[in-house]
């Protein structure tokens, strides 16, 4: 059995930054450090941070007064920011800078009274945070997930429309929705480049390359991870069966029966240690040395807040 490794895979710069912010806050200020929502969507990561003293909550009312709170990589609404400010909570913001970029697009449109259409998945925390940047009763913000949603959509002023998207969507599906928007609203404005982040794009490109050669695909990632789910869907769309797994213990040996080439990738919030455990399990079952495909190099990094940066010694 051959093991093919996607490249790139796993942690992106935004996830790295978010985890580092929590780790540094724990080191400097000591537990408990409160985090609104899972800082990234991965059970292993959240469990490790919880063991170190992070307390994960869903709403700010769960955070005691005079405490530190960290906003997750997915971002929060203006209302949540205002609530934290009103309560005097000390905030460290782990929102991915690429999500913040989308927030700024919405804020600019809102100030002008223009309407916004967000392409995204209902209920995802990133979508809730982005929708929550809009604050103008004269306009409006609408959520669509598919061309069918676009067909049913009615807006106030088709001449003053902007679209933006969740950063972790399927590249292909988003292109279909944008095409539908442009067809229905010819004057709609959008970002020069779509809002899907570089890491989402790169990991989907790697799966596209792998799926054409593999018999089955294992995607390391959490059920609530948007970008991990898109990797599984893309593989299946290309005709290669794919399974989303939290870790090696989730692999069913029956999935591999009759297959010579097993591909392994990981979502942007899945650590490499979980990938290594998957490879070890496959090798226990007769897998050969894993072969990593050549892929796009990623050298993007995002800085953490100044108060959390290590101070030079001497």
From Swiss-Prot:
Write the protein's name: 4-hydroxy-3-methylbut-2-enyl diphosphate reductase
Q: What is its EC number?
A: 1.17.7.4
Task: List the Gene3D superfamilies hit by this protein, alphabetically.
Answer: 3.40.50.11270, 4-hydroxy-3-methylbut-2-enyl diphosphate reductase, catalytic domain
Keyword Iron-sulfur recorded: yes
Q: Which organism is it from?
A: Idiomarina loihiensis (strain ATCC BAA-735 / DSM 15497 / L2-TR)
List where this protein forms a coiled coil: none
Q: Which domain of life is it from?
A: Bacteria
Q: Which residues bind (2E)-4-hydroxy-3-methylbut-2-enyl diphosphate?
A: 41, 74, 124, 167, 225-227, 269
